[in-house]
Design a protein with these regions (language model features):
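Polysaccharide-binding surfaces and accessory modules of carbohydrate-active proteins
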Residues: 24-27, 298-354
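Solvent-exposed N-terminal domain segments of exported/luminal and surface proteins
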Residues: 103, 108-232
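Sec-dependent signal peptide recognition
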Residues: 2-10
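Acidic, contiguous internal or C-terminal segments within carbohydrate-active enzymes
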Residues: 244-299
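Beta-strand-rich recognition/accessory modules
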Residues: 81, 86-94, 342-417
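C-terminal motif of bacterial Sec signal peptides marking the signal peptidase cleavage site
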Residues: 18-19
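Alpha-mannosidase-like glycoside hydrolase catalytic domains involved in N-glycan trimming
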Residues: 24-119, 150-154, 158-160
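Solvent-exposed beta-strand/loop surfaces of large extracellular or lumenal domains
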Residues: 58-85, 262, 309-324, 347-355
Length: 417
């Protein structure tokens, strides 16, 4: 009997040691909020290899993120456009001044619904449409490069008052059933006007243009967007190529290239990244302007969005927010208000003083500064609707202010083994 007890004791001790060893080998992603602003559903981004290096057998198919209560947190593993960099993203909620730990382990992933989605829409003249559970929009593609078409980096804002994905349904109804997406049937619409403007926001070159005034003996210098000979805003043609990177429960992403276009005496091509995460009203754009033959080291750029029937506006150093009346061609009484914002990366503006922020001569809310060429420049464009939670200009201004503050005070993310 004594031998039996000894065997049982050894087995229990081994189990305890195994349990302790397993706990000691647990991996945690530690998210610290050192700011004065609570963060709700803010995306955390980790190089997946950093987790794989300390977790043998961890894959995109079996990685699970758990919160403090042991519940799965929706996560996403995707490969960047370079086909090499692999990232894991999930969203954390952390109170001001606090730290939260998320456990990483191998397991069976739950079926997380897609909350960030985008795609090329060849059936609608090469649109590239994007959405999350809060906002939606599109940019125009090469099929709209005609002389009377909108040629712009600017985005078209789509309004939505539902958390489900709607762009595929709206395109199908518009193109196959003749049900216009320009009218609100209860969940939103496309009533925003872009044309040859920067629409809901974009980063573009900005030049000092010299115009000779007929009959006068002087030259007038006027700061403005780059204009073509007929006076339309241009940034070259619409995107030439696009590469879809991912959709998922946390993030959608795509990369666009633009053919060379003239900016003063220099030709530039451009690369733009679109990144939209779940649970936000703000789209991240990373733009790189590439001069031909290295003819420039720096350039003046303008982050801007067109203003229509504006009822409120707030201009800050790093952002501009405004609210304007929406317009439904079939229902002028009930369209509500659209809120729009542009936000410049505060890290960039710390090194590049602002030349101007306010309203440009052609009616854009804008921030003008100087940047190096061949440099990825990060900005955000934001939108909201009074029928989808953004019920006052004051609420929108506060949301934009807090978002800009969060970019200046990012979460501190580390891995603990």
């Amino acid at each position: 009997m004594k031998k039996v007890y000894n065997v049982l004791a050894v087995m229990m001790l081994a189990a305890i040691m195994s349990s302790c060893s397993q706990k000691n080998n647990d991996t945690f992603i530690v998210v610290a909020n050192e700011s004065d602003l609570p963060r709700e559903n803010e995306t955390v981004e980790i190089l997946f290899k950093a987790l794989q290096d300390i977790n043998e057998g961890l894959t995109a198919e079996n990685v699970v993120i758990l919160d403090a209560e042991g519940k799965q947190v929706p996560s996403q593993v995707y490969t960047e456009a370079d086909s090499t960099t692999v990232k894991l993203v999930f969203q954390a909620s952390v109170k001001a001044g606090e730290t939260v730990e998320y456990k990483v382990q191998k397991g069976v992933r739950e079926d997380y619904p897609v909350k960030a989605y985008s795609r090329h829409v060849p059936e609608r003249k090469d649109d590239y449409a994007y959405e999350n559970n809060k906002v939606a929009g599109r940019i125009y593609g090469p099929a709209l490069n005609g002389p009377n078409d909108p040629r712009t980096f600017g985005s078209d804002i789509w309004l939505k008052s539902t958390e489900r994905m709607v762009i595929d349904e709206r395109y199908y109804n518009e193109l196959e059933k003749g049900i216009s997406y320009h009218h609100d049937y209860g969940e939103g619409m496309d009533c925003y006007k872009v044309g040859n403007t920067l629409g809901g926001g974009a980063l573009v070159p900005h030049v000092l243009e010299q115009k000779e005034i007929a009959g006068e003996n002087f030259v007038l210098q006027k700061e403005k967007l780059v204009y073509d000979v007929v006076g339309s805003v241009i940034t070259g043609n619409n995107w030439a190529t696009c590469k879809h990177v991912c959709n998922g429960p946390v993030r959608t992403k795509a990369v666009f290239t633009y053919e060379p276009f003239n900016v003063g005496n220099v030709k530039y091509s451009a690369v733009r990244e679109l990144e939209l995460d779940a649970n936000t009203h703000f789209v991240k754009w990373v733009t790189t302007f590439i001069p031909e033959e290295h003819k420039a080291d720096s350039m003046v750029v303008q982050l801007a969005a067109i203003k229509h029937d504006v009822i409120a506006e707030h201009v800050d150093k790093e952002w501009v927010a405004f609210t304007e009346k929406a317009s439904d061609p079939q229902d002028n009484e009930q369209p509500g208000n659209i809120s729009v914002a542009v936000v410049y990366d505060p890290a960039d503006l710390a090194d590049n003083p602002i030349k101007y922020n306010g309203t440009s001569p052609d009616g854009h809310a804008c921030i003008v500064t100087k940047e190096a060429v061949n440099k990825p420049i990060t900005v955000w464009t934001g939108s909201g609707w009074s029928k989808a939670g953004i019920d006052s200009p004051e609420k929108w201004t506060e949301m934009v202010k807090n978002f800009a503050y969060a970019q200046k005070h990012p979460l501190n993310v580390t891995i603990k083994k």
